[in-house]
């Protein structure tokens, strides 16, 4: 339930990696396609269909423009999870009789890892690359992992939990030289950081609508035409979307995604400046008032709308309860129901105790200075209170190594 405090609406939304609010301009663009412009974009015999088809094609062009692609290379899906599945399984099924090896990274989104595990059960060999303590892959390890059987490398652009940006250009160069397809889940980076599919030699890229102030239930997959990339569809039917994804297209949602992409294209610089300023303000204020706070992931090679912080000596779940006026997460929204420490943090080598204390704060287009000020004040007072109550924090301050303690069992 929302409450108001000095013009602040509580709780304050700081979970922009899980989803983003719909930009009012996106809502406005979508509305006519729910009401008067309701035609099926595949109906070729009357103006209702033509009108819807024109809207779909305009959106396709706006999405392509944002990543330096051609409109025909954009295939509409229900979201990034479907796009990731279509890219990975689609390549494996189409090229599987020639090659049988895929490379991905231990810190990928769960849907990429699960799609790969599914293929492993079908006999595909999968290599899961480790990440360095800063969250970024080692390019030499990638190079050495590629064999003559490798058909696909899948590495995300921006990590959903820690916000680090992987070196896409360098990865793309390696893949192109070795004749391997390169897929990237760009859902967290699309419209937020500059990504050019040609500069980065990306062959397939997964996009989500609700991560860029667009609607939920819509996404896209970029599939390169030159040199041509072939995939086997997951869904068969009327042959829409160049035969790669059958089904009637949801015109209102597509218009929403196209509008969101167009806004991002025009306002990325402004959004980046805003987010970077609030990131620096938030982090500097927290660090100046609380000790032993750790930023997870590389400080520079990252999207600054994502701050994953570990607060030594307090449990992440108790922090979330203490700061309930802030809508935050202790990891990916897809796995935050589990109390296991984040697999992304563990794969970076973050100590299990510290991984349990991590909170992901999201900053976005609609975050205000006033909200950041309130958040900092609340976090600092609650962390200090929780640490005062924590015998573990007291022991840490006395220099006791918690790992060496033998706890009695009752």
From Swiss-Prot:
GO BP terms, alphabetized: [2Fe-2S] cluster assembly
Cofactor: pyridoxal 5'-phosphate
Organism domain of life: Bacteria
UniProt KW Iron keyword: yes
Entry binding sites for [2Fe-2S] cluster: 334
EC identifiers of the protein: 2.8.1.7
Residues annotated with N6-(pyridoxal phosphate)lysine modification: 211
Catalytic activity: (sulfur carrier)-H + L-cysteine = (sulfur carrier)-SH + L-alanine
UniProt main location, coarse: cytoplasm
Pathway: Cofactor biosynthesis; iron-sulfur cluster biosynthesis
Molecular function GO labels: 2 iron, 2 sulfur cluster binding; cysteine desulfurase activity; metal ion binding; pyridoxal phosphate binding
Subcellular locations according to the entry: Cytoplasm
Database matches in InterPro entries: Aminotrans_V_dom (IPR000192), Aminotrans_V_PyrdxlP_BS (IPR020578), Cys_deSase_IscS (IPR010240), Cysteine_dSase (IPR016454), PyrdxlP-dep_Trfase (IPR015424), PyrdxlP-dep_Trfase_major (IPR015421), PyrdxlP-dep_Trfase_small (IPR015422)
GO cellular component: L-cysteine desulfurase complex
Protein's UniProt name: Cysteine desulfurase IscS
Gene that encodes it: iscS
